[in-house]
Amino acid sequence: METLKEEEQFRNFDTPLLNTPHHLKEETQIQQKEREQQQQQQQQLQQQLQLQNERENRNHNITEELNKIPSSNNSSNSSSPNPLSISVSSSLGSASSIHLTPQGTIGNYLVIKTIGRGQFGKVKLGYHKKIPNEKVAIKIINKGKLDPETLKMVQREVRIMKLLHHPNIIRLYEVIETSRALYLIMEYAGEGEVMDFMIAHGVLTESQARTFFTQIVSAINYCHSKRAVHRDLKPENLLLDCNRQIKIIDFGLSNVFTPGSYLKTFCGSPTYASPELILRKEYNGPSVDVWSMGVVLFVLVTGYLPFDGDNYVELFQKILAGNYTIPSYLTHECKSLISRMLVVDPDKRATMEEIINHPWLSSTKQIILSTTMTDSLKNLNSCLEQQINVENLLNQSLNNSNNNNINNINNINNTMATMNNSNNNNNNNNNNNNNNNNNNNNNNNNNNNNNNNNNNNNNNNNNNTTTTTNATTTTPITSPIQNRNNEELDQEIIEELVGLGFEREELCNSIRQNKYNDAASTYFLLQGKKLRESQQNQTDNAKKLEKFYSEPLTIPAHVGENSPLIKYKRHHKRSNTVDSPKSTNTPQYRSSNTQQNNHHHQQQQQQQQQQQQQHHHHTQQQNQQQSQQQYNNNNHNKPPTPTIVTTQASTTVNNHISINNNNNNNNNNNNNNNSSTPGSNTVSSTQSSSINSSVNPSPLCLSNAVPVSLREKLREKEATTTNTTTTTTTTTTTTTNTSSNNSSNQSISSISPPTSTSPNLQPFSLASTANNNNNNNNSNNNSNNNNNNNNNNNNSLNSHIQRRATASSLQQQQQMQQASNTRRLRSNSSSVADQSQRQESRKLEDDWVIFEDYSNDGHRDGQPKNYHLQPSSLSSHKKQKSPVHSFLSSFKNILKRSDDKSFNSSSSNNNTNNNNTTTSVSTNNTPRTLEVDHQNSNNNNQQATSSSPNVTSPSSPSQQQQQEPRIVRFVFGVNTTTMKDAPELMQQVLKVVDTFCIPHTKKAPFLIECETEGVRFSIEICRLPRLSVNGLKFKRIGGSSWRYKSICKDLLSQMKLNSH
């Protein structure tokens, strides 16, 4: 009973609480919230105390460990042998002790490892000694390797980075300069490039792309407001920090512009370059960045580039024509924004104001405008307000109110003019006029008032002169000194820095005067760290990050190795392409996707086919031998009939076959032994297989480029075409060999189509004696054509050619041994004009490419830059065109060229084996059709020569390596280009080197090493297959860079690189 009563009392006690008025319930809820807030505050205070204690303990431990390390700025001498224990916080927030071995110390920073390589130096990861877990990026630039022009570019980059303070631009903290190097301490963005992010996640949605693009627009708009232009915007130069914030890097190509003027420096990456850069027109800075932003936005929303091509000619043509397609799945607003930015005419292209006000960015317009006004500008406004208030107080104490108002107006106009970045000269003129008016007005006043007004005017003039001096030296317009009070600075950070050993007054002065020293950099590092921690603790930001990364894609996208952007990644390992080295010991006629497991099985099958072909050749050639001899006896004065070998490959075959008989005395012996061994009138199985591999285009050249369907078709057609091609080639060789009994050294050539434009290369082993051999061969050819019935002359001629061939073969063997260990074999790529080959070849890889700076006349330092292809008809007295103009015009001339240009090449005889004639077949991997010469030998008294070098064994890599220069993929890998043949160009180089009396040694037929004036350098002739030209490459091995450049300029000035 008692328990029941207690329960009733408890219920009665609860009932009034349940029936309490509404306002009483609200009071109780408010009290509960206040209690919860107090508890949270207490927890936060406890956490802050714990963090402070942890920091003090870490600083104490680090200082003890750093005292053991010898303090030195030299990174080589300052590295400690024992590893340094540094507490590094992981991405999950848990602190873990990791043993890091610093490579050295630079100021207050420990250098850990190399994280990248820039245009002018390396970028290393560093840790601050006094701030735990604070990472920085240290860009190290070796001043000894910089010429005056690049040194100016580095200094300009530093000045522009000092000017820019934006949350989406990488920040410069400190500059340390020594006699040897320049150290730039910059902000570290640890999430990597946007390109890596897209390769890992695929195509971005429009909302994700909008967040990235909003930050890019905000940063670029801020740069343009500071009169700075980036000129190298691309996803590789966009980094991400831990809070998914864009950080723009690499201001090495940036410059300052003035409104209404034009820039003349042509730089950037080809796939992101605007049409005015390609056409070498003068341009205004913002339009170039707008075009690059359009390409970046296209890449963000589609996952591939809008302009792409197999080579630079096709790429530039698409850019100049504005030929691109926008996917249909994009919204109308996104399509319109991309189309407005990718306008070929820079005058009609969208401006930054139009981009900010575009409907696609309407939701983020306020973010762009708010982030454009950075802390520096806000502080500048506060400084102006303080100055105006002080001046008003001074003016109130004066008697003459009219003059005071004029001074206030002048001061306001002067300061607002610096904020709006107007012309400095106009501002100075206005200030001088205003000051003169003030002086005239002050003449009517008292002497005291005149003195005060003149002092104010002098102060204004001093402020204006500081800005004009910067403008005259083409430096960015720097903001005035930020007169920050101690109240504006973060007192917690200052107290922490004072505890670390910094003096309060020096610290405040360095921050106020915007100095880039140790004190200011440490302050800004702690400020940035505090801002990042506050952003990470915000729940809204964490939710946004989760939503950003978890947002589903509207279209399927390839990621990882299957991403279409993987080939544009600068550090990605390149796959085997047409220009990559390949071994030619194995038979070249195989499919492009053959695996290594089936390699030996294919070799066995080919050997069986070759053995079957040998028996077929013997029986067929014995039947044809008598008929061919009768035909040649009756028609020995007529030129050989043209034979055209066609195959069913996917590309057109343009190989040239030249057949030389060295011994006519051995014909009888060889004819008697036809039943047992193949003689001069037959071709061995190895030779027929080599002809087959040379006539058909090597599918190895199309590796990783031919689609799967084309590869399957090629594999199916290989089995059907092997037998037909070998029989046709053997019949052609027998006809020519039998006809050459009376006239040796006859060649079969055909009319080359206008698509075959690669210049002819002479045999590599006879480069030193090319002139003598050419003259002797031409005279021998003329004498043989005029005296076909004279056997004595033929015997003497053949013996002379045989002796020369054996001598050249000995020279080739010696050079093979020297060059086989140091040089690599590279196969030729297809011609620029071959349409079918271009469709099957691999797409152009966009490495970071920097064009050269040109003046109005296309020269730099008085030296012409022939980086691109120039037309052969260009004469010396004509005005020199720009490299890109000549590059495009020469491509048009190549397509229209027919038989105007004579292809001269020297046919050299090779060594003989067992007194048998050898068949020399051109083995250029570039496919060609057989040239047929219909000219009559009686009228012209001259035989047409083949336009490709003669190679004894096409399957041997060492000999093919010797007879062709090294392949260079891109134009910027050489110093200059020319249409001359490689042997002729080598003779020109040797002639110029001899005129300057420079001692040199010939390391290879197309490579020499020179040493003079304490400078050692090499000169190499390279091959540019994409442009069908030869390049000249200079490389400094040792010595002073100044003397090396002067020597190279002298040598290039004396070389005649234009083809005649």
From Swiss-Prot:
The residues covered by the UBA domain are 488-528
Composition bias of kind Low complexity appears in 38-52, 68-88, 409-475, 603-613, 620-637, 650-699, 720-760, 771-799, 811-831, 904-926, 935-965
Keyword NAD present in the record's keywords: the answer is no
**Ranges where the record places region Disordered:** 1-52, 67-88, 409-488, 560-701, 714-886, 899-966
Q: Which residues form the Protein kinase domain?
A: 109-361
Q: Which UniProt keywords apply?
A: ATP-binding, Kinase, Nucleotide-binding, Serine/threonine-protein kinase, Transferase
Residues bound to ATP: 115-123, 139
Which GO biological process entries does UniProt record here?
intracellular signal transduction
Q: What is this protein called?
A: Probable serine/threonine-protein kinase MARK-A
Q: Which organism is it from?
A: Dictyostelium discoideum
